[in-house]
Amino acid sequence: MKVTRAQAEANRERIVDVAGKLFREKGFDGIGLNELMQAAGLTRGGFYGHFESKDELAGLACERALMANQHYWEELSAKPPAEALRALVGFYLSDLHCQHTAKGCAMAALAGDVARAGPALKGTFETGVDNFLRVLEPLMQGGEPAERREQALAALSQLVGALVLSRAVRSPELSGELRAAAGASVLRSAAAG
């Protein structure tokens, strides 16, 4: 049975969505094409009808995951700056976010894989980082734009770093301490301006 153009596009979108979750959960090298396509409800043979390579899919999945995360941050940042930053930090460093890698922050889940990737994927990732910084900068209390930029860079580094470390340790107590300390530091720094 011939697949319609609309169905082919829907299949492609499903593959990208599933890949975004599986790549965040298992890394780019932690999932093979068979498992990925099976999770999307399709056969491996159809993969190359949609993508030239797994790298192409990784770029698209990374971009989509970063955009979804960014949209959520933008929703949270619609509040007054101090309230928005508290909401963003609270969500980002929550137990729920820490435990759900597949639906969580693409920066924290994929940074290690992207560091070993080629320039195209690094460019996609960098665009995502820049977009997150644009959300954070207005939430900082610094006077000059350069100061707010520096605060946003430090805040993003602390948030992502704390999430990465808290997912990597065995102890739930240490995981919580890492996230609590980073959150307190980000909020203190932003308020000090």
Q: Where are each of the predicted segments found?
A:
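A general structural signal for well-ordered alpha-helical segments in protein cores
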Residues: 85, 104-108, 152, 162
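Helix-loop "lid/cap" segments that line or gate small-molecule binding pockets
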Residues: 93-97, 107-116
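N-terminal intrinsically disordered/low-complexity leader segments
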Residues: 1-10, 193
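Hydrophobic alpha-helical connector segments
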Residues: 60, 74-104, 142
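Amphipathic alpha-helical packing segments from all-alpha helical-bundle domains
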Residues: 67-70, 74-76, 86, 103, ...
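Helix-turn-helix
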Residues: 14, 18-56, 60
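Short amphipathic alpha-helix in the helical subdomain of ABC transporter nucleotide-binding domains
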Residues: 8, 81, 85, 148-155
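Hydrophobic/aromatic-rich alpha-helical bundle segments in the mid-to-C-terminal region
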Residues: 118-127, 140-193
